[in-house]
Amino acid sequence: MLFQQVYVFLQKMNNRDHENHKIIAVDLDDSNLPIPSHEILQERKVAIFDLLSENFFKPIFPKNYPNSIGPYRLDISIKDQLLVFKISNVENHLIREILLSISPIRKILKDYNEICLSYYNAVKRLTPSQIETIDMGRKAIHDEGGRILINRFNRKVDMDFQTSRRLFTLITAIYLESSK
């Protein structure tokens, strides 16, 4: 009985901890980008919905850093070949800004875009087994993009693999627009 009570307590604590370490809002700053197509806007909405529905995102702060308790709001933009991640608390007070160079992920962003285009074209004209082969390649590149993001955020943000994959999707969307 005591074991069960301890287990329930730990589950509640874990759930509360998880609620504090998640993204609850995302804004993609596209003010300096071309107007996105209807398809791009739809992809963004789906990617944001997926990210917000389930994520683990825990910025790493020094101890007793003010206003650092989540959940978090995340603004993503590209400025001067840098990915800019502005992390705010629920009250929308900026608590951390992370700048990452696009250079280390530029190739995988382009590769992912190319294979996505191949996949969309394949759906219209290829057999299911051919489509499945392309989709497996797309998923592998997407996974690699997620792993690269986890490494790039090392010592800045702890996140799970699914969160990194979903962020990679959003970064791809705004990066491709910025490179047009």
Placement of each model-derived feature along the sequence:
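Long, charge-dense
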Residues: 17, 24-35, 105-128, 132-139, ...
